[in-house]
Amino acid sequence: RAAENLFWLGRYTERTENVTRLARITLQSLNGEDQTSQPLLTWLSAMGVSQGLVLPTVPAAGQARRVFERSLIAGLTQPAQVTSVGYNLRGILGAASAVRDRLSQEHWNLIVRAEAEFFAPRTGAEDDGDYSPLDALRQLEGLSGHTAAMTGQQTDRMTRDDGWRLLSIGRHIERLIALSRALALGLETGSVHEPAGFEAMVALFDSTITFHAQYQQRRDMVALVDLLVMDRDNPRSLAWVVQTLRARLARLGQSVAPQDAEFARRLPDPAEWELTELSN
């Protein structure tokens, strides 16, 4: 049971971090200079539905931008909406409470504080439904800081035993699902072929600084695929995530779950990926 809770602690932490980043990028884009980019709005709408930030019945951002925005903001703290930021944050707290003895006091305090601050009662105009994008962004930025700190605790402050490997596997499964889906939708909608959509994709992969350090002002698909798909030194790239999953599963298969070694072998080996094939 502890192993299962560690696995879900990893998944909920990664999922919360991902949907928080997506919500921030969406609100920033809807209120920035690029709000007229139709491919970007189409991608943001598709991602919002895909990641559960808005319901499928909500009009797309390109059709009714403010309705889409208000729906996203209203859903952030809905714990009954099973894909909301708030629900996933409560999921972290629930899984962590079941493995409290495996976590440092600082790690536990971070989780409790993040949940308390995110669900803190709104006051004044906020209670009347007038919760502005700026207010929501501040709320999301605070949570982003907390989830980044949780990631640090899980990465550097836990013993790397089989329980930790399950937590890590949970995180990387979630990361692979979210990022591969984002890239697929970016290609389907054509958003990555426009400057605003290109930058939003790199930001969702949390790779903006790395990208501009390596490629300066380039915005071509070869550079995008190289960093976000192929780069096995970038912990946000698909290759790094798959490579790490293979290693974690193989190690787990040596000790407690022989079938996991077989799962690891079934995952594609990033060492065999070819940039020329993937970027065509």
Predicted regions span which residues?
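Alpha-helical transmembrane segments and their helix-helix packing motifs
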Residues: R1-N280
